[in-house]
Regions:
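Alpha/beta enzyme core
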Residues: 1-186
Length: 186
């Protein structure tokens, strides 16, 4: 789904990177020397994932992805039949699982997930990144790009120029907010 619509669900990086690799191999097989892969992430607005990522050691990509899950610490006394549990930071936790079998991310983790998605995609074959946002917000996208460029200095962004965004109104609001926050008399 579009990043500015409800109902987005992400997949673990391994699933997405398999698609990037498939495109890169298709370029090689077909002799496409100037093909460009644009990796899009809707993590900013996605509150759900279809599955828990596979992780083999603390700090690996799967562990980083799972660290964004909304979890509760549990003990053997409050484990239920059918519960899914993972080990995180030396504790046993239960990710919040919905009746749809989707798992919920913690609130407020969207920007950090976008940064991780983007860095991971660029390190694994993507040429450009596309971060889908709910509205055009230059400050928000700039903050994420600044974080990405700490790891990948030459990272390049493709940004959504969707007609469903009211660009003029949103930019005017951003200028107004900036002036108000800086104490200018408006």
């Amino acid at each position: 789904q579009c990043g500015h619509q409800d109902g987005k669900v992400t997949v673990p990086h391994a699933d997405f990177l398999a698609k990037i690799n498939a495109v890169r191999y298709a370029f090689l097989e077909l002799g496409v020397d100037d093909g460009i892969i644009v990796a899009r992430t809707d993590s900013l607005g996605a509150g759900l994932t279809k599955q828990i990522a596979i992780t083999n050691e603390e700090g690996d990509l799967g562990d980083q992805y799972n660290s964004f899950l909304d979890v509760e610490e549990i003990t053997p006394d409050n484990m239920n039949h059918g519960d899914v549990m993972i080990s995180q930071n030396g504790k046993i936790v239960r990710p919040k699982r919905l009746p749809s079998n989707l798992y919920q991310f913690r609130k407020g983790t969207g920007e950090a997930r976008c940064v991780l998605d983007s860095i991971t995609s660029l390190q694994n074959g993507a040429d450009l990144i596309w971060i889908e946002t709910e509205k055009p917000h230059i400050g928000q996208i700039a903050e994420m790009m600044n974080e990405i460029r700490k790891t990948i200095p030459n990272a390049k962004l493709v940004y959504n120029n969707s007609p469903s965004f009211n660009w003029t109104l949103n930019f005017r609001q951003q200028v107004f907010d900036s002036m108000s926050n800086s104490g200018k008399d408006i």
